[in-house]
UniProtKB/Swiss-Prot annotation:
One of its GO terms (molecular function) is ATP binding. This is ATP synthase gamma chain. HAMAP family: ATP_synth_gamma_bact. InterPro entries: ATP_synth_F1_ATPase_gsu (IPR035968), ATP_synth_F1_gsu (IPR000131), ATP_synth_F1_gsu_CS (IPR023632). It holds the Pfam family ATP-synt.
Amino acid sequence: MPSLKDIRNRIGSVKSTQKITSAMKMVAASKLRRAQEQAEAGRPFADRMARMLASLAANVSGATGGPRLMTGTGSDQVHLLVVVTSDRGLCGGFNSTIVREARRTIKRLTGEGRTVKLLCVGRKGRDLLRREYAGMIVHSFEDVGRRRLSFADADRITAKVLELFEAGEFDVATVIYNKFRSAITQVVTAQQVIPFAPAVATEPAETAEAKPLYEFEPNEEKILAELLPRNLAVQVYSALLESAASEQGARMTAMDNATRNAGDMIKKLTLVYNRTRQASITKELIEIISGAEAV
């Protein structure tokens, strides 16, 4: 049985941990509000951008085929997975769910005879995937949005993806990230970004009479060639915003659970301490009484 001093020390240690987790919960809650506002504000723009490009792509003549970012390379042999995780831990299953989905996708694609390459955003995902798939990682980004997430962060990632695409390093690119729903709910999402798929976001159905007629200057293909790289950056930025909000929500929930568990442990240890102390006092009384009777 542990001594009273040992139990007191353990209670003190758990209380210190509880203070830390409680403080981290409050910090995460503060960051979550800002990250959630950014993610929700960015959704309409990203959705509208995708719908506009889908509508524009529908007008491109099939004769020329359109830009490669829309038509692809004509093959789907090599897949690039952009895996978005965090740089820090203590956020529950936030990173493990993304890595699990990445592993599942890798196994499915390799099982079909495809080649897979990885671009990791976030230290945690890179470290976990490197254990099994070190040879697949072509590039990684750390400290993305460390101070404050900005469009420049998405631009850096997009520039690397486009560089790899133009070099013929892959045929299809998919971003895997956590989409924010609430502080306790994050949905793992796999979104194909190259080639651009108009079917993923289309304008609401319109009658022939109501459908407007547009005249494009310059032609649709040139406009698409300019807008598709920008749309890629927008979609990457949207994924980063969703991931940032999901990370803070997961961290707040994890720290809240840790704080509650610490409170329960303190109660149990206090009960053990009181029982041990009571047993010690009772033992001393018995010894005193026994000694008095012996006299």
